Amino acid sequence: MATVEELYRSYGILADAKDDVGQHKSAYQVIIDGVKGGAKEKRLAAQFIPKFFKHFPDLSDSALNAQLDLCEDEDVSIRRQAIKELSQFATGENLPRVADILTQLLQSDDSAEFNLVNNALLSIFKMDAKGTLGGLFSQILQGEDIVRERAIKFLATKMKTLPEETLTKEVDDYIFSESKKVLYDVTGEEFVLFMKILSALKNLQTVSGRQQLVDLVSEQAGLHQTLNPADPDSVDRLLQCMRQAVPLFSKNVHSTKFVTYFCEQVLPILSTLTSPAESIDVQLEVLKLLAEMSSFCGDMDKLESNLNKLFDKLLEFMPLPPEEVENGDTAANEEPKLQFSYVECLLFSFHQLGRKLPDFLIAKVDAEKLKDFKIRLQYFARGLQVYIRQLRLALQGKSGDALKTEENKIKVVALKITNNINVLIKDLFHNPPSYKSTVTLSWKPVQRTPDSGQKRTSDETSSTSPPKKPIVGPKRDSRQIYNPPSGKYSASVGAFSYEQRGGFQGGRGRGWGGRGNRSRGRIY
């Protein structure tokens, strides 16, 4: 067992040898043996072993293993010192192994130790990004769940801090191909993180890159399968995937496949969908997603059939006027509930797809059904005007902080909803129906006009040509509820309340593929 004096003596021999350091193998072996000593010897060994490591390839395995022993020492200060120096072993063929080891060390619950591991990983990333990624993905695919989770989060948060020259096209391609392997079996939270990782890749900022991401989401969403409305996991999966897809669509990257699936598979069973969480109005979430996607729908094979499905669903949410009693009044308990939030989504989607078949209401819908629709439309429009007046009156004279109260914020959103519906209904009242108006969906931010002297942005304000957005996951907004005097509003209006939860309900391993839990231990 080497003593402190022997360690210093051996260090002196190696330091003084300069170009001939490789000839003093026995001195380096003494330093390696220092890991068997006490705390002082171990601390010195943790510093000395990496310093001369590159000069003794024959002892590389024993030197690295000795350093790893120190990384697992009971003394936290020794562990930290050993981890801090690990990146010095990342040369040549050793780099992927060191990356693998550092990835496993991410499971540390000591914050200082965890930060050292992160810094070491970033440091070897700059030496060899692809080799480092090999170690990370090895653990993501095969490691313990805690290691997998932290490795994914490392990629999602730290890669954006790397110098641009580190992430070459070859590295981007490697990340994409390895990520596709991981995505065969992920939880909902992992899927969202991987979309964040992939969306940040320079290679995928192009139209073809976005299309690749859309295809990836399509596979995850299971658009080739029939949706089981009774399975909350299946519904949850669809919602999460669609929320990741929406920011990717543009005039060049179409949502046709997704809109078709919603019209054919989801709308007919909308009322039977099982919500993945009590706080989620799953029908409204689905309709909002459909509305957002409809702006980017390309040529559709079964356009008339899908417009019919959308039209039928719209009719469900647009009630007929109540029958009048003998004195000409309407019984209060018979007055239909006007569900404005749902109707905004359905009308917007119908308006978008109707542009592609402008004679649908004239030539494709029979006379009786069209007459019924116009009666419903007129009744809805009358109720709409009442609420618009009430809302404007309630908000009249209010500005600044007064509009920031929760109640008034909800009323502002409600006014957006009713104004949108009003514009769309006016288009449909035209003879023939018009599809020229543009509105911004009530839960989408309105692009402000740039101040004079400021550089004008390239973003559009119309929902039919929405602003270009970075390819990132959706922001989480709080649900806003508006209860007008007569209680005819949908119970929920405003922004998406859907939360990205980790995993899914039920005992299905990782939720999307049943990885299951393994306890592998460290596999240095």
UniProtKB/Swiss-Prot annotation:
Keyword annotations: Apoptosis, Nucleus, Repeat
BP-aspect Gene Ontology terms: apoptotic process; negative regulation of apoptotic process
Protein name, entry field: Apoptosis inhibitor 5-A
Native species: Xenopus laevis (African clawed frog)
Stretch list, region ARM-like and Heat-like helical repeats: 1-360
Principal localisation: nucleus
Main function: May be an antiapoptotic factor.
Taxonomic lineage of the native organism: Eukaryota, Metazoa, Chordata, Craniata, Vertebrata
Subcellular location: Nucleus
Segments of this protein annotated with the region Disordered: 440-524
UniProt subunit comment: Monomer.
Cystine crosslinks: none
